[in-house]
Amino acid sequence: RRIGMLFQQFALFPHLSAEDNVAEALLDHPATERRARARDWLDRVHLQGLHHRLPHQLSGGQQQRVALARALAREPQVLLLDEPFSAVDRSTREALHAELTELRVAFRMPVILVTHDLEEATLLADRMCILNEGRTLQTGSPDHLLQSPESAAVARMLGMRNIFTGTLLAHEADHSLLRWNDLTLKVRPHRHLPAGCEVKWVIPVSGVLLMPLAGRPGTPLDNPVSVRIQRLLSLGEQYRVNLESTGQPLSMNVARHVAQRYKLTEGETIEVRLRGETIHMMAN
């Protein structure tokens, strides 16, 4: 079968050099061509000068490149990647992501990537398939899935934290009205759902914003909400801010310099706006 496979643990032959590992995928070629082809593929994945090293003489990222070169050397019709980047450090993983994207475009081959890493999936995928216990829950482009999950289960698997239950009150000319506890929120139209039904709804952390400074207008679908800061969690250049509103937990991300500018502190009450154009409702 013309299928290339790249495994999480690389599966390199420990007694063979990088060049010979790649050559193992070329046994259907004349012996005189194998080494030249193997060296060419190693060069394509930026392993020039490392052809004769054994796997234990290579870093994890270099071993991964050897395995990728071996998978591609057979010029497969499809490439299957089984969590191939989970065993390397972040900087190496980012470099491999870029190289894989370039190779995929160059060879125009379909790639099936199995991963638990949402960031990796959204970065590399043209289409995503959400699987749970052997069942397909939803397929589509990364943007479509993130903006319009079909169920709360899909939203949770996509890492969304702000998932709630509410009631779709009515449809207006350019928006719908959503009842959430004692608040009425204006959201983008959801005319496929009947007014009066109970719904699940989600808002991404990027859809929860600090109220703008005085004089800066919002949008027609901004929903001002008073919230209490429960916890500030440092994530490097930004904070994850855990909030509480009407007894419900709510999360947003705030850049570190913005948090410092607003002097955010745990326990204080602040005003945020829920961007109605980012709110997505689903049948309950």
What would you call each of these model-derived segments?
Residues 147-177, 202, 273:
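C-terminal boundary and immediately downstream tail of ABC-type ATPase nucleotide-binding domains
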Residues 178-179, 243:
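SH3/SH3-like beta-barrel fold
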Residues 1-4, 8, 12-156:
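ABC ATPase nucleotide-binding domains
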